[in-house]
């Protein structure tokens, strides 16, 4: 994998943008609409993004208590799948078994 794709983590950037949006929608209770549209973003779990995760979870729990409507559209969730298809075109990747083969799951 090229070094350019390992330099940054989108999770911390997305967390910085989404948390204020959700906090704004808590009072007064407003509907929340989020559309994800990533194009080949490498989603890595860096230390900084893992530190931000509890803040995102707690903010979402506060929003959930307001019982406001929520809509999330996952346009492209296949960034890793696209990478696998690019480098593993010669065989079909079975999503159920492939994670166990590479050691992603116990």
Curated annotation (Swiss-Prot):
<dbReference type="GO" id="GO:0016874">
    <property type="term" value="F:ligase activity"/>
</dbReference>
<dbReference type="InterPro" id="IPR029045">
    <property type="entry name" value="ClpP/crotonase-like_dom_sf"/>
</dbReference>
<keyword id="KW-0934">Plastid</keyword>
<dbReference type="GO" id="GO:0009570">
    <property type="term" value="C:chloroplast stroma"/>
</dbReference>
<dbReference type="InterPro" id="IPR011762">
    <property type="entry name" value="COA_CT_N"/>
</dbReference>
<protein>
    <recommendedName>
        <fullName>Putative acetyl-coenzyme A carboxylase carboxyl transferase subunit beta-like protein</fullName>
    </recommendedName>
</protein>
<keyword id="KW-0443">Lipid metabolism</keyword>
<comment type="function">
    <text>This enzyme activity is not detectable in leaves.</text>
</comment>
<dbReference type="GO" id="GO:0005524">
    <property type="term" value="F:ATP binding"/>
</dbReference>
<keyword id="KW-0444">Lipid biosynthesis</keyword>
<dbReference type="GO" id="GO:0006633">
    <property type="term" value="P:fatty acid biosynthetic process"/>
</dbReference>
<keyword id="KW-0547">Nucleotide-binding</keyword>
<keyword id="KW-0150">Chloroplast</keyword>
<keyword id="KW-0276">Fatty acid metabolism</keyword>
<feature type="domain" description="CoA carboxyltransferase N-terminal">
    <location>
        <begin position="1"/>
        <end position="106"/>
    </location>
</feature>
<keyword id="KW-0436">Ligase</keyword>
<keyword id="KW-0275">Fatty acid biosynthesis</keyword>
<comment type="similarity">
    <text>Belongs to the AccD/PCCB family.</text>
</comment>
<keyword id="KW-0067">ATP-binding</keyword>
<dbReference type="GO" id="GO:0009536">
    <property type="term" value="C:plastid"/>
</dbReference>
């Amino acid at each position: 994998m090229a070094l350019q794709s390992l330099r940054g983590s989108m999770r911390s950037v997305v967390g910085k943008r989404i948390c204020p949006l959700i906090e704004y929608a808590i009072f007064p209770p407003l509907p929340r609409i989020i559309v994800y549209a990533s194009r080949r973003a490498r989603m890595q779990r860096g230390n900084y993004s893992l530190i931000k995760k509890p803040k995102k979870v707690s903010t979402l729990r506060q929003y959930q208590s307001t019982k406001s409507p929520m809509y999330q559209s996952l346009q492209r969730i296949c960034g890793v799948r696209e990478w696998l298809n690019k480098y593993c075109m010669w065989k079909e990747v079975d999503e159920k078994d492939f994670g166990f083969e590479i050691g992603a799951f116990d």
